Amino acid sequence: MKLAIIPVTPFQQNCSLVICPATNRAAFVDPGGEVDRLFEVLQKRGATLEKVLVTHGHIDHCGGVAEVAERAGVPIEGPHPDESFWIDQLDHQGQMFGVPGARRFTPDRWLHGGDEVTVGDMRFEVRHCPGHTPGHVIFASTQFGVAFVGDVLFQGSIGST
């Protein structure tokens, strides 16, 4: 697996660009904003975006989801349906927290615990992890020993992913 971590927005939330080395297909996980910058990284990596994966509906994790999906013509997968409240509030969250361009979206696929998502030939198990938000999900791969956890776990702090 190839991976790029891209801190975005004033929150410095980590958006992940996950690339399958076998197919060169990619997904953004939690594109919170700074969409032009995200596409620059994608272009530099020479990968083809196939989808957007979303862990939860807070502005710093999904403020750029609608724009990324529209610009690339790719589907949105996740989060869990219990996040619809937060996603419906994205326009307001963007105004409150100064994230321009943030707007609501409708996932092409809502996710549930036990579902599977793919990026190229790579497979990730979806785990529903309510707590930070009701519909928070994570994407875990035992094959690669990695999990994209959104705001379920923090390394060395209580708020910087």
Where are these regions (language model features)?
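Divalent metal-coordination and catalytic microenvironments
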Residues: V18, D30, H56, V68, ...
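Residue-level signal for pocket-adjacent positions within structured domains
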Residues: M1, D82, T106, H112, ...
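Short, basic and Ser/Thr-rich N-terminal targeting/leader segments
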Residues: F11-Q12, R104, G120, T133
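Short Gly/Pro-enriched turn/cap motifs at secondary-structure boundaries
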Residues: I6-V8, V99-P100, T106-D108, H128-P130
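Generic preference for hydrophobic
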Residues: L3-I5, V29, V52, I76, ...
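Conserved beta-strand hairpin/beta-sheet module of binuclear metal-dependent hydrolase folds
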Residues: M1-R45, I138-G150, Q155
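Active-site HxH/HxHxD metal-binding segment of metal-dependent hydrolases
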Residues: T23-A26, E34-M122
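Metallo-beta-lactamase
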Residues: H92-Q93, E116, M122-T161
